[in-house]
């Protein structure tokens, strides 16, 4: 089978031969039909990979501290080799996968062979995914639409933390893929929505989905526009889906919010906060974690132990289901978010488009090779140049 891997040393992406994962207890083996390239996360990963070693360090200061500590204990040369080795490890890209269940592991009762499912599997012909990270697709939802379910769940979890009520005014800062999906879900919750972004084409889509818009790139003041949008009382909540190194989105969110307003960070921003902005209004600020409860919990994800329904209503899997239900009901429209479609074998072209077109949103990969071909076992030998002076001699027996 084939899979997309990224070289973290230089940011290059390749479609390469990889071993077919073996289905195991509590897992599904899925034959992929469609996958969505996450414009935000994957563009950030590719950009990080292409950065110099110094720029990589600047982007991850917490890792620099770990490296410096390792230098003190293990020495400079050993640490340098360890860093280079870490960067040389290829990274599997993708987490928005749609496919057909090919095999069901022991202990899985809610899925069967032939089911159409979404999962957070990577960009690959065949993926093995824990059952709690999969959800069945309704018959009237296409594979292309369903591929947006996982990324939409990221926005949905932010909404759940914000707890919007009918008629409230909300701001979505960052009208990228997650932001535009969040806008639609807030509108479905009966909220008035203001979208803030520097990209007018994305704001035009936000307006199409029923939001008011603000473009700071045209000299519009987000705080003033937000206060006017709230009719002078301050907005009830702000969901930040932007990705930026500066703290402006959080600062602006605090200043446009009403007393006891809610601010939810779904994206990535700087966090240099002014205490007075939050103290005087008793604002709530919370960082949202991915798709929802269960994320990064090995008991839930890897071992398949679900949370009690009565205590955790919305797990990450149940968020997947909720998004798919909205699509089935026509409440969530992703068709305008599809920018381009590529054959899986041409994925490198898709990643070129991802880095070249900053306005791009939904890039879809289509998988058309026969399942039998994907399951063929092949051995791929990578050429290695050996210098005689670096030869290693070993003895067996």
How would you label these PLM feature ranges?
Residues 37, 111-112, 164, 257:
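Short, well-ordered loop/turn sites that connect or cap secondary structure elements
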Residues 4, 228, 232, 237, ...:
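C-terminal capping/lid region of NAD(P)-dependent oxidoreductase domains
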Residues 1-90, 121, 366-378:
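Short N-terminal strand-loop motif that marks the start
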Residues 162-164, 204, 209-288:
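Glycine-rich cofactor phosphate-binding loops and adjacent beta1-alpha1 units
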Residues 121, 197-198, 289:
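Conserved acidic E/D residue at the C-terminus of a beta-strand in Rossmann-like folds
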Residues 116, 142-220, 224:
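Mid-domain Rossmann-like dinucleotide-binding core that forms the NAD(H)/NADP(H) cofactor-binding site
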Residues 273-336:
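C-terminal substrate-binding/catalytic core of Rossmann-like NAD(P)-dependent dehydrogenases/reductases
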Residues 78-89, 96-120:
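A glycine-/small-residue-rich N-terminal strand-loop-strand element
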